[in-house]
């Protein structure tokens, strides 16, 4: 790794800087002093999804819309210029009229997964096929913990290996 001291005017906010809008004469941000890389008097912020005209946006102001029913819209805190970390509905939450289950902000539907993997004629296999995932052996499991496969609980059998038929 290369270690170098902070450089005011390089557009990167580094240790000791509150903002960095480029070199004096190039800076177009009224919230940032380009010579010192400090906020201008009265400014709370210079950049960020929750910064507007040098002030923090109010608490509850949406800064990132939900992309799907498995995503959660994020709102400004009123204390920071940054939008909070992207958050999702809990994994396993039913979605799309119980056709799928939320997973990391998406709603994968088993039929769509089969179609994408095996072509237009592929569909999800009968429920009985998914009972293999309760074994916790070989390729049939829900998760691994310390290298050991963990079988799926009855309610989670469709969270393990995907079974499709042509």
Swiss-Prot record:
Record-linked PROSITE patterns: DISINTEGRIN_1 (PS00427), DISINTEGRIN_2 (PS50214)
Tissues expressed in: Expressed by the venom gland.
Domain annotation Disintegrin: ranges: 5-91
Matches recorded under Gene3D superfamilies: Disintegrin domain (4.10.70.10)
One GO process term, biological-process aspect: proteolysis
Glycosylation site residues: 33
Cofactor note: Binds 1 zinc ion per subunit.
Subcellular location as annotated: Secreted
Ligand binding (Ca(2+)): 7, 10, 12, 14, 17, 20
InterPro entries the UniProt entry points to: ADAM_Cys-rich (IPR006586), Disintegrin_CS (IPR018358), Disintegrin_dom (IPR001762), Disintegrin_dom_sf (IPR036436)
SUPFAM superfamilies to which the protein is assigned, alphabetical: Blood coagulation inhibitor (disintegrin)
Known function: The hemorrhagic metalloproteinase-disintegrin-like bothrojarin-1 is a potent inhibitor of collagen-induced platelet aggregation by blockage of alpha-2/beta-1 (ITGA2/ITGB1) integrin. It does not present any fibrinogen-clotting activity.
Listed name of the protein: Zinc metalloproteinase-disintegrin-like bothrojarin-1
Record organism: Bothrops jararaca (Jararaca)
Lineage: Eukaryota, Metazoa, Chordata, Craniata, Vertebrata
């Amino acid at each position: 790794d290369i270690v170098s001291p902070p450089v005011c005017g390089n557009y990167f906010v580094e240790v000791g800087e509150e903002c960095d809008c480029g070199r004096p004469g190039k800076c177009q941000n009224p919230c940032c002093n380009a010579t010192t890389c400090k906020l201008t008097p009265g400014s709370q912020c210079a950049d960020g999804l929750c910064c507007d005209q040098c002030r923090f946006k109010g608490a509850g102001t949406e800064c990132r819309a939900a992309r799907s029913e498995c995503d959660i819209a994020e709102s400004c805190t009123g204390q920071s210029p940054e939008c909070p970390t992207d958050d999702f509905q809990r994994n396993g939450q039913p979605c799309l009229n119980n056709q799928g289950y939320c997973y990391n902000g998406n709603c994968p539907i088993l039929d769509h997964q089969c179609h994408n993997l095996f072509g237009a004629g592929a569909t999800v296999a009968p429920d009985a096929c998914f009972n293999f995932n309760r074994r916790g052996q070989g390729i049939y499991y829900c998760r691994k913990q310390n290298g050991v496969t963990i079988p799926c609980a009855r309610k989670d059998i469709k969270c393990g290996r995907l079974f499709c038929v042509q």
